[in-house]
A protein has these predicted regions:
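N-terminal secretory signal peptides and thylakoid transit peptides that target proteins
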Residues: 1-22
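Core beta-strand elements of the Rossmann-like FAD/NAD(P) dinucleotide-binding domain
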Residues: 126-132
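Beta1-alpha1 glycine-rich phosphate/pyrophosphate-binding loop at the start
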Residues: 29-104, 148-149
Length: 152
């Protein structure tokens, strides 16, 4: 038996896959109606989850990804930009790949999630119903929370 070292990318894929698989069964509905999953956040976690929920359900789940930004910058390889090996444009992509997989991409900001009514409210005033919601907004540094720390 050999031991394999897993990369951070492998761990992320396995984590997203676990979330996706756990959500698939929960979205099953009667009479052939499609389940609805709303994914909040279009970073690595949210985008991967949205893609694989759609793929693994063979189109049986309506997946909507909500992300305010129209493009995604791959931060894990951003050191290549700092080092001059790449330009930021080479690490930036839009969400068309998810759309090709059947994911509905909405560029807006979530203002509230009502778990009782199963609704997501957007800054535009639109509400989206869901059977399951995946919240993956990414990180936000709160420098002011650490004494002596400030943004560069």
């Amino acid at each position: 038996m050999s031991i394999r070292n897993y990369s951070r990318r492998d761990v992320l894929k396995f984590s997203a896959a676990g979330v996706a698989v756990g959500t698939l069964g929960a979205c099953a509905t009667s009479a052939g109606a499609k389940g609805k999953v709303v994914v909040v956040g279009g970073g690595w976690g949210g985008s991967t989850t949205a893609k694989y929920l759609r793929l693994w359900s063979d189109g049986g789940i309506d997946v909507t990804l909500i992300e305010p930004n129209t493009s995604f910058v791959s931060c894990p390889i951003s050191n290549l930009v700092i080092g001059g090996s790449r330009r930021i444009e080479q690490l930036t992509t839009n969400y068309d790949g998810l759309r090709r997989h059947g994911v509905n991409v909405v560029h807006d900001t979530v203002t509230a999630i009502d778990p009782d009514k199963r609704l997501v409210r957007l800054a535009s005033g639109q509400t989206l119903p869901f059977d399951r919601a995946v919240v993956s907004p990414g990180i936000e540094f709160m420098f002011e929370q650490v004494k002596g720390m400030s943004p560069a």
